Swiss-Prot record:
GO terms for molecular function: rRNA binding; structural constituent of ribosome. Belongs to the bacterial ribosomal protein bL9 family. One of its GO terms (biological process) is translation. This is Large ribosomal subunit protein bL9. InterPro entries: Ribosomal_bL9, Ribosomal_bL9/RNase_H1_N, Ribosomal_bL9_bac/chp, Ribosomal_bL9_C, Ribosomal_bL9_C_sf, Ribosomal_bL9_N, Ribosomal_bL9_N_sf. Binds to the 23S rRNA. It holds the Pfam family Ribosomal_L9_C. Keywords: Ribonucleoprotein, Ribosomal protein, RNA-binding, rRNA-binding. Signal peptide: none annotated. One of its GO terms (cellular component) is ribosome. Transmembrane segments: none annotated.
Length: 150
């Protein structure tokens, strides 16, 4: 199915690009989420009429993400979790736990933004973690996992 992208989508294209994707991806995700429209003549004309407005909106979203990236870059976020004597955690630290710690620090983030390439953190220590606030704004933070005191 051919669609018009209404925002930049990593691995797919930029605002206004006409791309071909699988029908299910378009119907079940991109179109309902407002990220794309079918590439019909009427939709293309409507898009061209609204192009400046959509570009301004995307620029505003990117500027907001860059501000949050500036606040986050280089920060150390501490997460306390119960641990054994050998430093292994009872449970693990997930992206939801890290996102909650970032929000507690006063910066807006959701768990989908936190990228843990090696899966949940299962031991005490410091870990480099990426927080993808936008496709063009990725902050690198240090997550310090410490043993919780009871």
């Amino acid at each position: 199915m051919q669609i018009i992208l209404l925002e930049k989508i990593g691995g797919l294209g930029n605002l206004g690009d006409i791309v071909t994707v699988k029908n299910g991806y378009a119907r079940n995700f991109l179109i309902p989420a407002g990220k794309a429209k079918r590439a019909t003549e009427a939709n293309m004309k409507e898009f061209e009429a609204r192009r400046a407005e959509l570009e301004a909106k995307q620029a505003e979203i990117l500027a907001d993400a860059r501000v949050r990236q500036e606040k986050l870059d280089g920060q150390t976020i501490t997460v306390a979790q119960k641990a054994g004597v050998d430093g292994r955690l009872f449970g693990s630290v997930t992206n939801a736990d890290i996102a909650a710690a970032i929000v507690a620090a006063g910066i807006e983030a959701v768990k989908a933004n936190v990228r843990l390439p090696n899966g949940p953190l299962k031991a005490v220590g410091e870990y480099e973690v990426e927080v993808a606030l936008h496709t063009d704004a990725v902050a690198k933070i240090t997550v310090a996992v410490v043993a919780a005191t009871e």
